[in-house]
């Protein structure tokens, strides 16, 4: 946790900017391409936060269809495949340092496994830093899921207004797994869960 917080101090501004750009620009592009908001949101979440993990976390909250999820995963992993090959070449061409490339890869590449592959393809130091940046970026899943839960609740209430028979229950929309994630993180950092058990739970 301390390492993530240390890295976060240096990368937070960059990550916030890229997340805002990703969701803002992604929404406009999705609208221009005629994508529904669920498909567009999943692609944006996968691209901006944590690839398939973000899509898996947000999809049930917004009640995405299998097709929405398929489009989101396909777009995310397609971008990842290109980035793994192109980023190290561009990094060397631009003469980036290990830290600069690690920050770039950890912020821009989608999925965690792809970040690891891209970072270590450049250098070991870049791979180490990219991985920590990515782990910090992954924490954005928590507020993102809560925001999408609020959006879904708003849409449900709007539907209820138009169709009085529709019932809206916060308990069915709220992402309860977030509380479990936070509880396990707190217990692990307090040393209340043995390292062996923590590795199994992960």
Residue ranges and their predicted role:
Residues 1-3, 146-202:
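Structural signature of multi-pass alpha-helical membrane transport proteins
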Residues 2-27, 70-82, 198-202:
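Entry/N-cap segments of selected transmembrane alpha helices
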Residues 2-10, 91-100, 120-129:
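Helix-coil boundary and interhelical linker segments in multi-pass alpha-helical membrane proteins
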Residues 6-15, 127-136, 167-173, 195-202:
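Interfacial loop-to-helix junctions that mark the boundaries of transmembrane helices
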Residues 8, 29, 33-37, 41, ...:
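Membrane-interfacial segments
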Residues 19-31, 51-56, 80-92, 112-116, ...:
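Transmembrane alpha-helical segments of multi-pass membrane transport proteins and ion-pumping complexes
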Residues 35-83, 100-123:
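Alpha-helical membrane segments and immediately flanking helix-loop junctions
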Residues 100-154:
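Aromatic-anchored, glycine/proline-accented short structural segments
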């Amino acid at each position: 946790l301390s390492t993530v917080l240390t890295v976060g101090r240096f990368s937070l501004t960059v990550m916030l900017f890229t997340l805002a750009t990703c969701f803002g620009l992604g929404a406009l592009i999705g609208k221009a391409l005629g994508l529904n908001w669920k498909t567009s949101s999943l692609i944006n979440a996968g691209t901006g936060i944590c690839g398939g993990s973000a899509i898996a976390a947000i999809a049930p909250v917004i009640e995405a269809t299998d097709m929405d999820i398929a489009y989101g995963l396909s777009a995310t992993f397609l971008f990842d495949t290109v980035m793994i090959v192109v980023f190290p070449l561009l990094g060397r061409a631009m003469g980036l340092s290990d830290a600069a490339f690690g920050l770039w890869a950890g912020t821009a590449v989608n999925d965690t496994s792809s970040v690891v592959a891209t970072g270590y393809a450049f250098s070991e130091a870049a791979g180490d830093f990219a991985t920590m940046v990515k782990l910090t970026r992954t924490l954005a899943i928590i507020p993102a899921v809560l925001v999408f839960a609020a959006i879904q609740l708003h849409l449900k209430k709007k539907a209820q207004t138009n169709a009085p028979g529709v019932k809206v229950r916060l308990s069915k929309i709220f992402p309860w797994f977030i509380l479990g994630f936070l509880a396990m993180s707190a217990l692990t950092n307090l040393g209340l869960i043995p390292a062996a058990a923590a590795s199994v739970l992960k």
